[in-house]
Amino acid sequence: MVAMFQEDNGTSSVASSPLQVFSTMSLNRPTLLASSSPFHCLKDLKPEERGLYLIHLLLTCANHVASGSLQNANAALEQLSHLASPDGDTMQRIAAYFTEALANRILKSWPGLYKALNATQTRTNNVSEEIHVRRLFFEMFPILKVSYLLTNRAILEAMEGEKMVHVIDLDASEPAQWLALLQAFNSRPEGPPHLRITGVHHQKEVLEQMAHRLIEEAEKLDIPFQFNPVVSRLDCLNVEQLRVKTGEALAVSSVLQLHTFLASDDDLMRKNCALRFQNNPSGVDLQRVLMMSHGSAAEARENDMSNNNGYSPSGDSASSLPLPSSGRTDSFLNAIWGLSPKVMVVTEQDSDHNGSTLMERLLESLYTYAALFDCLETKVPRTSQDRIKVEKMLFGEEIKNIISCEGFERRERHEKLEKWSQRIDLAGFGNVPLSYYAMLQARRLLQGCGFDGYRIKEESGCAVICWQDRPLYSVSAWRCRK
Amino acid sequence: QKKKRNQPRTPNSDAEVIALSPKTLMATNRFICEVCNKGFQREQNLQLHRRGHNLPWKLKQKSTKEVKRKVYLCPEPSCVHHDPSRALGDLTGIKKHYYRKHGEKKWKCDKCSKRYAVQSDWKAHSKTCGTKEYRCDCGTLFSRRDSFITHRAFCDALAQESARHPTSLTSLPSHHFPYGQNTNNSNNNASSMILGLSHMGAPQNLDHQPGDVLRLGSGGGGGGAASRSSSDLIAANASGYFMQEQNPSFHDQQDHHHHHQQGFLAGNNNIKQSPMSFQQNLMQFSHDNHNSAPSNVFNLSFLSGNNGVTSATSNPNAAAAAAVSSGNLMISNHYDGENAVGGGGEGSTGLFPNNLMSSADRISSGSVPSLFSSSMQSPNSAPHMSATALLQKAAQMGSTSSNNNNGSNTNNNNNASSILRSFGSGIYGENESNLQDLMNSFSNPGATGNVNGVDSPFGSYGGVNKGLSADKQSMTRDFLGVGQIVKSMSGSGGFQQQQQQQQQQQQQQQHGNSRERVGSSSDSADRSSMNVNTGGGPASTSPPYGIHHASF
């Protein structure tokens, strides 16, 4: 393999612009092995072989991207582009987005090129399109439904007997959750409370739409209700804007939001040291192996007992790493704590996509998005435009962010429940175990609505939504410790 | 500039917390004139009054310096506002709160006989009582809010149900994924489904307040449409309606039925008041749409035994209308089908579609490796592996090649990523034969269908899944390619691998035992944790936490 790439180097050493490299590449088709299948046969690969080869290519490419060798990366990218396709089978689709992300990343090392290429690309920030994709995600996956159900249940239980309830929604994009809460409150034996919902979202239109739907429903149910829109990005949110008043019982709901606070500039330092390792890939290997070796045997046995995601690549490494301090997350959590909410419900992606090296993140995200794309494969026909939208505009963008961004730009810093628990605990919150009823309902939702293949695992009072054995999202409830 | 009345106040500010006694709060005329014994609510008023008697008087001046903000506690210990963190921001507020929530309702409206504890509330009500009318979309008028809500619940259920009906009949399994439909429509479906499910815990509360009406989130009925039999259809329909029940033990029963008797609900809907068929009832029900009261009350057979149905027809308010969440019915259908295969039980979480069941012949949820997910979409088409499965296979192959070629025992734990990593880096590294392996395995026909013939890095994978049945063993064995492992074992016998092999063999040979083994060890774990509890129980509860508990 190395030989092959060296061959490429030899032929394309004259070429300095991507276009030229491309042309020489297409003339001088690299062969997989000198004797066996030639490059043009790649198209004839069986899906499974193609899938494996795509994975292989992605990893090879990532190695080249990490070490910054454009030419080798380019060779791999070309093959990837031949095989990957956003409307092919699952692996082809995943590979298409990872390929784009990797290309994006290596292109960033040529800031001039990168900027020139993206200069005219006006970010088509179509609000309605964004809402539409979010809505499709809501429909195609049970994740938000389960999250909303568990969140509402936790709020209802915490607010038993309360007459003045204030709910803060840190991602006010989906009215369905609060419509459900309104109805649930309405059927409380002690009658509905005075309900105030504060929605935080950066787009005014979204909040307006939400306010309209909720006020309409509250009027229909005749529940005293007030919607308090806060147009702000979550990072710029001032706690004063939330207008929490004395005497009211406060609940906070955060759905897939907290991880954005982890974005920080301390990458600069980490990136530097990461680069050192990346230049020496075998070093990374060794380090990883070392990291695994202690405790892995014991943990493997532990896994036996607890049926704990047996093949999860992250379980071991996550626990052995110290929690990196994150000033912004901590100060935000502290600010929330200062409002002394009766309950705070947090939904997060349960994956470890915040590794310091590209390779770590690539591997972890490959597994996660493989599972997510598999979910779609079982539910939605391949030709569906909606499916492609979700894959491209939601997952594709996330992948791009995880793979090709660094520093403040890298916002999709998904972390495992374990780490979130530590953080939230440190901020002065105590875990509120999700009730039996909540879990029962969530399981029924999965069973009853055709979401086969999903599972809900209980992990120390929190819920982990899994696809098969792969944990995807976690829901946990908290309250102020005093 | 208009003064803001409701200045937001953050509760955690360093305000002075004041606890007043009930007597102080209830006192109407705390400030008494010593001459004429007239009482006043405020001292300022008394001072002004004293002027009339030519007594010395003094009005308090507004102090220029910033006064420390005060917050007031409710004296009632069971009240949420008894907690300092939930104190109320002003004196009038706490007084009214105390009257409203913990005081006697002395003021009664003559028109609707609603009672109020605070006179101003009563006054405000009296002004609007009778003038405000509640109009339902169906055209019916109500003067009282609760009758209106009762009506709305029924009326909504009907509207939603009739809107859903056509789709139910087609019984699309993917009902909640109406790709072709417009967003609004699917919006309603999806959200109401949540609603339906969010009610499922609610029936426990019903015995307290008969006047309460639960609104049905009938969206769950749509989910029920996934099943196709006619009884299922009925169940789905019925789920849109209210069941009447006055059975305090309803909760228990429901609980019980969650666990064991899911199936029996499915077809057994019993119509309490009408000899007509269920479907006819439905029809009639929808005809009665415009009357405020429904003419038929449906009941479930499991409730009928101890259920005296009150006359809901004439007075919907008096009746405790209970919504049995559609989720129950719908799940029961599901369980009905699944029990035969998986053995049922609330705990069996991952239910697999039937095509899986048939192909993989009695696989319980935990033990189905995700490789099988590939066959979910089209069981009859050529097998295509899911992306997850491909990644796993890649990881396996990576480990194989690294074992065979590097000669180094790369710590075969079940951490797939390290293996995958070595897969990637191995290729990048010195070994050309890695790729040879990769390509060889392509040509190896055994490798395409399943992972046969590949050394398994998931030595403990099978072991992870407790309680595999005998049937499944062959599956698992094929899957893990144990034969190959044994072969490769002889080549390189690292400790890890031996361990792995042992695990595999255990898994094969002592499968029946594995459950017991796990059980007994968890037993001992239980015991030890109990010991810990009894030993250090009181000491281990941290004081702040305890206080916290008490305060809520």
Swiss-Prot record, chain A:
Residue ranges, annotated region (Leucine repeat II (LRII)): 209-241
Region ranges (Leucine repeat I (LRI)): 52-115
Domain GRAS: 45-479
Tissue localization of expression: Expressed in seedlings, root epidermis, leaves, flowers and siliques.
Region named PFYRE: 250-401
Keywords from the UniProt entry: Nucleus, Transcription, Transcription regulation
GO cellular component: nucleus
Sequence motif VHIID, residues: 165-169
Region span, SAW: 404-479
Pfam families: GRAS
Residues in the signal sequence: none
Localization per record: Nucleus
Region (Disordered) residue spans: 302-324
GO MF annotation terms: DNA-binding transcription factor activity
Keyword Nucleus among UniProt keywords: yes
Region (VHIID): 134-199
Tree of life domain: Eukaryota
PANTHER family named in the record: OSJNBA0084A10.13 PROTEIN-RELATED
Functional summary from the UniProt entry: Probable transcription factor involved in plant development.
Family as reported in the entry's similarity comment: Belongs to the GRAS family.
Protein name: Scarecrow-like protein 3
Protein's organism: Arabidopsis thaliana (Mouse-ear cress)
Gene: SCL3
